[in-house]
Regions:
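N-terminal export signals and maturation junctions of secreted/periplasmic proteins
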Residues: 30-88
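Short glycine/threonine/proline-enriched tight-turn/helix- or strand-capping micro-motif at secondary-structure
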Residues: 247-251, 264-302
Length: 430
């Protein structure tokens, strides 16, 4: 299996048992945050164009129902046998960034004709000029990262009111695709100087040809754009008050437990985005005792009931029928299978104690832990006010914020506030 590298670094972490007992923090394990992406005003000008009549459906762009039901192995076997040994890389990174594999396959066909006319050159640079990287896995991960960064940056900009759209035909997925496809033009200011920007029509047509989806599935009216959910990070606080977070934007308070077996206590670090930078703060890292590589590690359990997608040898997603899902990364010895229904507290494997197992498709981590994320309909969602069992999350002001006055987990059963690195007993869902 091909493995590529992402930058790594240690984060300062440690133990703090409660508001009343905070001690000095040693260094522990986590993942390296990616650099935060900021929208350029030229990108906003580029997408406000009349050629985009209806926005691309966010639900088709994200790794939601359509993606989870897509038989990638069968599609590759029938249509692109040269990609058989790339299947896990595609599912892993598409799942990690939560973008429909159909999106990346469509872009590959547009850029290199890898599916219809495969060549060695196309296999090495399947996404062509969309990425400066060399190699299949490198370009795959890079372009998915670009799409994810643009998607969530656009949602954040809309929540903050920075760039009010001049057309209803642009949503987060349309912006992400348009900004990616026009990246070179934006860098050269060609779009602003009169050169026509690339619209979404070629992408949508190629998507139709490959997968047979209809316009009704691919496009959406402006009244049903699946709007983003408010976050409470520092960058959002002045724009969307926490009072605006409604019950409909949160999973049921009795739905989730912590992602380890009931009856045990683990520890969590501060909330962060799925990539460690930007918005929303949908994830936490958890471990029994934050050991070194090679030390014993323990069972990961489903936080709720739902259907399993095994995304790779080290990553699993569980999706409930109500659209809420949880993602589990850096796993090993996975015991569940694709399509299996699991109940809450079902053991699905362990978090890996071997670096190569934890990073089965590349990446970096400085020690064993589970990277746990919350999603709704494929979109990463803030953990703010989410109940993980008896603990209600307050995400803090920024990624990996460990200050207990900002990031904490309120124990509603015992009326106390728990800080990062405090032992959290898993009694199941409320």
């Amino acid at each position: 299996m091909n493995i590529f590298k992402i930058r790594s670094a240690a984060l300062w972490i440690g133990r703090a048992l409660s508001v009343s007992a905070i001690i000095a923090l040693p260094s522990m394990a986590s993942d390296m945050p990616t650099s935060q992406y900021h929208i350029d005003s030229d990108e906003i000008k580029m997408v406000d164009m009349p050629s985009v009549l209806l926005p691309f459906n966010n639900l088709m762009f994200l790794y939601g129902v359509d993606a989870s039901q897509f038989d990638l192995a069968d599609f590759i076997y029938v249509n692109a046998p040269d990609l058989i040994d790339k299947e896990e890389a595609i599912t892993h990174w598409a799942g990690y960034y939560s973008i429909n594999p159909k999106v990346i396959l469509t872009l590959m066909e547009m850029q290199s004709q890898l599916i219809s006319s495969p060549t060695e050159k196309a296999l090495n640079r399947p996404l062509g000029a969309l990425s400066d990287k060399q190699g299949f896995e490198e370009q795959l991960q890079d372009v998915l990262a670009q799409l994810s960064q643009r998607f969530y940056a656009y949602e954040e900009s809309q929540l903050k009111g920075l760039y009010p759209p001049r057309t209803d035909a642009v949503n987060a997925s349309s912006f992400a695709l348009l900004a990616l496809l026009n990246g070179r033009r934006i860098e050269q200011h060609a779009v602003m100087s009169g050169e026509h920007a690339l619209g979404l029509d070629p992408f949508i047509e190629q998507f139709r040809l490959l997968f047979g989806n209809t316009d009704r599935e691919l496009l959406m009216s402006s009244v049903a754009q699946n709007p983003p959910v408010a976050d409470s990070t520092q960058s959002m606080q002045q724009v969307v008050p926490l009072a605006n977070i409604t019950a409909s934007s949160l999973p049921p308070s009795n739905m989730l437990q912590m992602p380890w077996r009931q009856g045990y206590s683990w520890q969590s670090n501060g909330a962060h985005s799925h990539t460690g930078s930007g918005y929303p703060l949908s994830s936490i890292d958890v471990s029994y005792d934050w050991p070194q590589w090679g030390s014993p590690t323990y069972s990961v359990a489903s936080a709720h009931g739902g259907t399993v997608n095994v995304l790779s040898h080290c990553q699993v997603r569980v999706t409930n029928a109500n659209g809420w899902a949880t993602n589990y990364y850096h796993m090993d010895q996975i015991t569940v299978r694709n399509g299996q229904y699991v109940n809450q507290n079902t053991v699905m494997g362990i978090y890996a104690n071997n670096k190569n197992a934890a990073l089965c498709e590349g990446g970096s981590s400085t020690g064993p832990h589970l990277h746990f994320s919350l999603l709704k309909d494929g979109r990463h969602v803030s953990l703010q006010d989410v109940h993980l069992g008896q603990y209600r999350v307050n995400i803090g002001s920024y990624n990996y914020d460990n200050n207990c006055s900002r990031f904490n987990l309120f124990d509603v059963s015992n009326n106390r506030t728990m800080c990062a690195w405090a032992p959290l007993y898993n009694a199941g869902s409320l």
